[in-house]
């Protein structure tokens, strides 16, 4: 009976052994899980073609370039598996024959001389380093079995491809291929594949950059094995043995540092693939370095290039020199908030075209104005009087842009831009106002470049794509016709040429901007394929006297444009939209008039949007007789009379806006354009038979303040003339509209006072204050 029980117990033990073994393995697996996940892994940012841009090492300073099996040349995989572990795809993580051989060699020698390690076991050692002892070997075997339990063969091989040591701080075939050879691991030759396959066996001793002879000998050993096993032909091996150990200049990836830093926060991936073009990025950074010597002290620059056909960002230079602290090289000016100056002007003109407020030849008024406490001026401190919208945009005049924004509405304008991804940054609690159009709000260069794509994307502004998988998103900003017209104006081709004469290749359309106090210089350009954004200035916001967009940013814009043209074929110009037609309009009314019509004082050819001919846009205060078109009554002699005079007949007359009178030839002023008044039945309120005169100070007078007085008080009177008075002191409008005005002068210097009445008569006087 005891013998029977013993035999039965043995059978029970044998039957239970697999279960107990499985239970023990399961428990050990739970107690000592595989260390697959790193807390702070190495990361790399790469260009769209896979070229590494910038590496971010892990806590141990290790650099990796993550790859998949598909990213690696089949030649390397053949060399690796056939040299290191021929039975990799079949064994369970441990090759019993190799282990037995290694164990016998180790036992007979009394020390570990042969590892017998499979690729799975090598991965186990990489994940969980251990001493080269028998206990360490058992631990390695256990980890290998764990790997095979939890992962597929492809996953284990992928771990090896990314964790194998290749010398120094390099881990993985991706990092090694780029660091040693300057190429993708997908493009390895037979010779290169063999060299890199053997390198992890002794990465310090076989480093090709330090020991090329050793690396060549090890490579040849692998090549011979490939020939013996029939993996590669003898001819291929022979040619590969003759290939010298060639290495690219050893350097870590150093492109787009600020862009790469930004991308770390946008992706959790160990390898962040971006839309940047590595070749273009390198050219842009070389250009920035060459440009550094032209910049004033403590100044920097920023550049962005966007392919407007698909909204991919192709180049991004955030500063002139990352390592130059005096120029705040660590500050990315592409996504910093700065005052854009006049760069917003094309948007307000395009939106006003769609709104039917203006057309390209609309008469605008570049004259002194004051709106409350806001008194804008032009960059050149002068005024140009009557000017078309096209000319105002080309010359970047401020007063016409303010006039159009006032009609469109600053709050509405800011909301429209915000809706398409161009937020304007205002001080806390501030509301959008007329200063927006002259740089009175902050903006980012990246947002500005994205918004400018509307001029190349049929009026739709796209969202920048930083990674290839980012969706293509866009929102309408203006109509296709308005975008086409504004782009032509920015290319300085506002004249409505015949279609046959339009350029076949899209020219560079561009706009500059200069912020208040010369703190920022901008230039944004749109060519056939790209939008180029340029900024120069001091990151700390201090002024750079003499820096403005045309002088500081446009030369850099042209250099970038030349680089782009040399790299890609020119794309054809977009055809003229059907909504855009040619027309001829008249000034001052702004609309077409028949030939010979006396109200057409000047004819201008222009593009028209949807055939619309908006009348001349007036300032808010220009109504009634101060406007452009109003009725007059004439007697049988052609003289002006009151409406209720006998035999009075009505006619409509177009005159120029009153503020433009000082810039008009005498024949175009109201005093000449309006027929003389009848003395027998004059128009109501008219005493223009008396010339307009100015009294209170004689021409050439010298004015002095009374002793102890802070100012000189100068009462002035006007007589004659008709209607209200318009007063200008040194070209600046005064708020008074009456016949008399009192000046309070505090500054010494030359003065010119001008008064104008409702019919355009002018009286002037010059004097000096001492």
UniProtKB/Swiss-Prot annotation:
Keywords: Carboxypeptidase, Cell inner membrane, Cell membrane, Cell shape, Cell wall biogenesis/degradation, Glycosyltransferase, Hydrolase, Membrane, Multifunctional enzyme, Peptidoglycan synthesis, Protease, Signal-anchor, Transferase, Transmembrane, Transmembrane helix. Residues 1-8 are cytoplasmic. Its main location: membrane. It is a single-pass type II membrane protein. GO terms for biological process: cell wall organization; peptidoglycan biosynthetic process; positive regulation of cell division; proteolysis; regulation of cell shape. Pathway: Cell wall biogenesis; peptidoglycan biosynthesis. Its EC number is 2.4.99.28. Transglycosylase activity can be inhibited by moenomycin. The active site is at 84 (proton donor), 342 (acyl-ester intermediate). Residues 278-559 are annotated as: Transpeptidase. Disruption phenotype: Deletion results in an altered mode of murein synthesis. Residues 43-213 are annotated as: Transglycosylase. InterPro entries: Beta-lactam/transpept-like, Glyco_trans_51, Glycosyltr_51/Transpeptidase, Lysozyme-like_dom_sf, PBP_1c, PBP_C, PBP_transglycosylase, PCN-bd_Tpept. Residues 30-770 are periplasmic. One of its GO terms (molecular function) is peptidoglycan glycosyltransferase activity. One of its GO terms (cellular component) is membrane. The chain crosses the membrane at residues 9-29. Cell wall formation. The enzyme has a penicillin-insensitive transglycosylase N-terminal domain (formation of linear glycan strands) and a transpeptidase C-terminal domain which may not be functional. In the N-terminal section; belongs to the glycosyltransferase 51 family. Due to the fact that PBP-1c can neither substitute for PBP-1a or PBP-1b, nor rescue a PBP-1a/PBP-1b double mutant, it is possible that PBP-1c has its own distinct function. Moreover it does not bind to most of the beta-lactams known to bind to other binding proteins, suggesting that the penicillin-binding domain must be different from those present in PBP-1a and PBP-1b. It may function as a transglycosylase only. PANTHER family: BINDING PROTEIN TRANSPEPTIDASE, PUTATIVE-RELATED, PENICILLIN-BINDING PROTEIN 1C. This is Penicillin-binding protein 1C.
């Amino acid at each position: 009976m005891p013998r029977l029980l013993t035999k039965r117990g043995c059978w029970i033990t044998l039957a239970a052994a697999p279960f107990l073994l499985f239970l023990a393995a399961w428990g050990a697996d739970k107690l000592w899980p595989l260390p697959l996940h790193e807390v702070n892994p190495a990361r790399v940012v790469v260009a769209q073609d896979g070229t590494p841009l910038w590496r971010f090492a892990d806590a141990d300073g290790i650099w990796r370039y993550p790859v998949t099996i598909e990213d690696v040349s089949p030649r390397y995989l053949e060399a690796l598996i056939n040299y290191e572990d021929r039975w990799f795809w079949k064994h369970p993580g441990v090759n019993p024959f190799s282990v037995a051989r290694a164990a016998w060699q180790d036992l007979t020698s009394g020390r570990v001389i042969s590892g017998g390690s499979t690729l799975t076991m090598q991965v186990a050692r990489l994940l969980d380093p251990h001493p080269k002892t028998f206990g360490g070997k058992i631990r390695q075997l256990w980890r290998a079995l764990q790997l095979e339990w939890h992962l597929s063969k492809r996953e284990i091989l992928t771990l090896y491809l990314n964790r194998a040591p290749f010398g120094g701080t390099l881990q993985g075939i991706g990092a090694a291929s780029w660091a040693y050879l300057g190429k993708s691991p997908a493009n390895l030759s037979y010779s290169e594949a063999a060299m890199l396959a053997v390198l992890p066996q002794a990465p310090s001793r076989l480093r090709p950059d330090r020991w090329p002879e050793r690396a060549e000998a090890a490579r040849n050993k692998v090549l011979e094995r490939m020939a013996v096993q029939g993996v590669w032909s003898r001819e291929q091996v022979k040619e590969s043995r003759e290939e010298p150990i060639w290495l690219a200049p050893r350097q870590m990836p150093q492109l787009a540092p600020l862009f790469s830093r930004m991308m770390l926060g946008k992706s959790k991936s160990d390898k962040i693939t971006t839309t940047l073009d590595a070749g273009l990025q390198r050219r842009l950074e070389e250009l920035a370095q060459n440009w550094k010597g032209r910049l004033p002290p403590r100044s920097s620059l920023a550049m962005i290039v966007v392919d407007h056909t698909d909204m991919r960002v192709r180049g991004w230079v955030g500063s002139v020199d990352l390592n130059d602290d005096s120029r705040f090289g660590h500050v990315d000016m592409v996504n910093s908030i700065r005052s854009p100056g006049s760069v917003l002007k094309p948007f307000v003109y395009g939106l006003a075209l769609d709104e039917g407020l203006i057309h390209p030849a609309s008469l605008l008024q570049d004259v002194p104005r004051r709106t409350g406490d806001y008194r804008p001026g032009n960059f050149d401190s002068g005024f140009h009087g009557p000017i078309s919208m096209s000319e105002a945009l080309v010359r970047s005049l401020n007063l016409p842009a303010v006039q159009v924004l006032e009609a469109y509405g600053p709050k509405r304008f800011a909301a429209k831009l915000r809706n398409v991804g161009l937020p304007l940054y205002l001080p806390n609690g501030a509301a959008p106002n007329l200063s927006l159009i002259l740089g009175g709000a902050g903006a980012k260069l990246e947002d500005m470049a994205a918004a400018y794509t509307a001029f190349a994307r049929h009026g739709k502004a796209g969202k920048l794509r930083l990674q290839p998988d980012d969706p293509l998103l866009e929102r309408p900003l203006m109509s296709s016709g308005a975008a086409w017209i504004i782009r032509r104006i920015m290319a300085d081709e506002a004249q409505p040429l015949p279609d046959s004469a339009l350029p076949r290749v899209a020219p560079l359309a561009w706009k500059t901007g200069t912020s208040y106090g010369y703190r920022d210089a901008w230039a944004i350009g749109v060519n056939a394929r790209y939008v180029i954004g340029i900024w120069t200035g001091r990151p700390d916001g201090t002024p750079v006297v003499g820096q403005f967009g045309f002088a500081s940013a446009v030369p850099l814009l042209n250099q970038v444009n030349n680089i782009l043209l040399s790299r890609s074929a020119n794309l054809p110009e977009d055809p003229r939209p059907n909504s855009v037609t040619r027309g001829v309009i008249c000034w001052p009314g702004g609309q077409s008039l028949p030939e010979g019509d006396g109200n057409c004082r000047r004819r201008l050819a222009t593009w028209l949007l949807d055939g619309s001919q908006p009348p001349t846009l007036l300032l808010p205060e220009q109504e009634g007789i101060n406007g452009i078109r109003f009725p007059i009554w004439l007697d049988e002699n052609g003289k002006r009379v009151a409406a209720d005079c006998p035999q009075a007949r009505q006619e409509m007359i177009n005159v120029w806006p009153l503020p433009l009178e000082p810039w008009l030839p005498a024949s175009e002023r109201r005093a000449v354009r309006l027929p003389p008044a009848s003395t027998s039945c004059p128009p109501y309120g008219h005493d223009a038979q008396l010339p307009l005169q100015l009294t209170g100070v004689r021409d050439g007078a010298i004015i002095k303040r009374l002793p102890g007085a802070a100012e000189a008080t100068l009462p002035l009177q006007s007589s004659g003339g008709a209607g209200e008075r318009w007063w200008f002191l040194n070209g600046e409008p005064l708020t008074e509209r009456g016949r008399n005005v009192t000046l309070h002068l505090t500054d010494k210097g030359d003065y010119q006072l001008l008064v104008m009445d409702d019919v355009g008569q002018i009286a002037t006087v010059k004097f000096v204050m001492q």
